[in-house]
């Protein structure tokens, strides 16, 4: 089967020689690779940060502080073209940029949640795709990434993120926001089931759909 996506990050390092003035000058290609990768990481991190400004509230399923965006798209792009670890780095940098330039209304809790979810999505999807580089493999990889990030989102929000939110806003007020969406939300656990779960599925599959549409056109810019 033909390859649909292509992981093109070079592995290892070596040397080549270029003649100058009758002499052979050794150039460390590992340094060149690192410089090129840092440039790509910087570009994708900035794009991800900019996309965080374009948010869509999902008032039918999520409280006001949970909004849909596609800022995970550059994270996925980096993970698929350079490797899973690079996706995690880009996810971290885009949230650091958001904290510095955009500020936070959640004392950094929202950015922490975004990093956990974004990096999990990119890592799982790109790791699976490395061994299944076909169109079908891409769909399977992205679906696995969405499911993984949704499960982790529920666990991290239940155990860490929402308890931290409660230090900024009373937990009763947070639950009340959920209850206004559906009376089925009566506590933190039901908030995870009826709000966090569908929200992350919608976000993940929306980002995946955009990724499938634009990857082949945009990825050459980030390949070697």
Outline where the language-model segments fall.
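Loop-helix junctions at membrane interfaces
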Residues: 2-5, 13-224
């Amino acid at each position: 089967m033909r390859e649909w996506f292509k992981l093109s990050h070079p592995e290892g390092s070596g040397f080549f020689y270029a003649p100058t003035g009758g002499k052979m000058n050794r150039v460390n290609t590992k340094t060149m690779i690192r410089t090129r990768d840092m440039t790509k990481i910087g570009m994708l991190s900035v794009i991800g940060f900019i996309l965080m400004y374009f948010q869509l509230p999902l008032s039918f399923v999520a409280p006001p502080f949970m909004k849909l965006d596609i800022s995970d798209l550059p994270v996925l792009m980096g993970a698929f073209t350079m490797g899973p670890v690079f996706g995690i780095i880009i996810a971290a940098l885009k949230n650091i940029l958001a904290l510095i330039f955009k500020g936070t209304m959640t004392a950094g809790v929202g950015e922490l949640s975004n990093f956990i979810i974004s990096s999990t999505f990119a890592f799982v999807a790109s790791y699976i795709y490395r061994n299944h580089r076909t169109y079908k493999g891409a769909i399977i990889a992205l679906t696995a990434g969405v499911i993984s990030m949704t499960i982790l989102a529920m666990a991290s929000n239940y155990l860490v993120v929402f308890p931290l939110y409660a230090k900024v806003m009373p937990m009763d007020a947070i639950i009340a926001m959920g209850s206004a969406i559906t009376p089925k939300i009566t506590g933190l656990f039901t908030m995870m089931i009826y709000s966090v779960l569908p929200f992350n599925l919608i976000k993940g599959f929306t980002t995946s759909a955009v990724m499938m549409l634009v990857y082949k056109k945009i990825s050459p810019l980030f390949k070697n």
